[in-house]
């Protein structure tokens, strides 16, 4: 199995290099991984010559948000701790490469035994934390061989994963690298127990702690508050074109509704296409922000605010009466907890099966799934007209977040007591 895995890694790398010839995004990924070890060596020599106290590895932005509460907890207790943060995805690295609580931020290099050994030689981490889905066999094998304390946090497992297949022995073995696996639910714990992995704790998802921290910061924009006034306000987070195909018709038919749209991608082509579909006055975030970052007055005729910048969405959900979260017609929905923490009902597309919080909130009545334009129209019309329905859904969403706080504290106490 291991030779097959390594061959697969090599083929994936080759495919990425071929794709990079025509895609700037893939080219960024390939170049970032190619220079990762050299960059790590240079930055470590400069900022952490004695190595790193903690190495956190995440796939992309979503997993970074799961690691972030733990990093912040560590740094608040030990400001001098050196933290290495690695990303697999360019979308995560490019946004968070200057994350102020990390001593060094780099890509994870291609997962070969040679690269894994060299990374550990350079970084010399004293504690390793992987997040959710990241299972790189060569890297985990090297960590285990060196007896470096390693932990997996916010993990979730499903019966269809390779760990639970007859041919998944090498992947099952890699799980033994982790001294403790912190899972989100009982089903994950039971699946692991069935394959002999018992160093497992149910702690839930650290993202609940993260979104609660954001909410408590109470970042506000008075100009937006004045603009929305008493109007029903819909916020659409991480919007993709397939989402827009279904909800824009409703938006155009309701000029009385104030709408905030944060596209997942906002290059010139994407923004131009979105503007053309909106049959209502709209303004870009960058057109109303001052040099010091404050929002100026929003033109009175504006019905839609398009957020074409990173880092604002989580705070803007506080102004919503209802939220649509995108991604449900693609690879999967984006972060719904960021909205639910404000006590706001969340609506999303059908590709949500891998997200425990989506299943929980649908069952409880704090979130709703839609497939067609008629579905979304029916839901939004009811939320606008039935105050009891909207109030119940809102309360349910907020209460769900509060009921699931605390994973970060448990994990922090464990890994620091074992350090």
Q: Where are each of the predicted segments found?
A:
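Active-site and donor-binding regions of nucleotide-sugar-utilizing enzymes
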Residues: 17-217, 235, 239-241, 254, ...
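Conserved catalytic-core segment of nucleotide-activated headgroup transferases in glycan assembly
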Residues: 63-77, 217-289
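Nucleotide-activated donor-binding/catalytic signature segment of Leloir-type glycosyltransferases, i.e.
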Residues: 96, 100-105, 274-307
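Structural alpha-helical scaffold elements that stabilize or flank donor/cofactor-binding regions
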Residues: 119-121, 174, 227, 316, ...
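Acidic donor-binding loop of glycosyltransferase active sites
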Residues: 123-127, 298-331
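Hydrophobic beta-strand scaffold residues
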Residues: 148-150, 259, 282, 346
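Catalytic binding pocket for nucleotide-activated donors in carbohydrate/polymer assembly enzymes
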Residues: 178, 194, 313-399
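C-terminal alpha-helical cap of glycosyltransferases
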Residues: 404-419
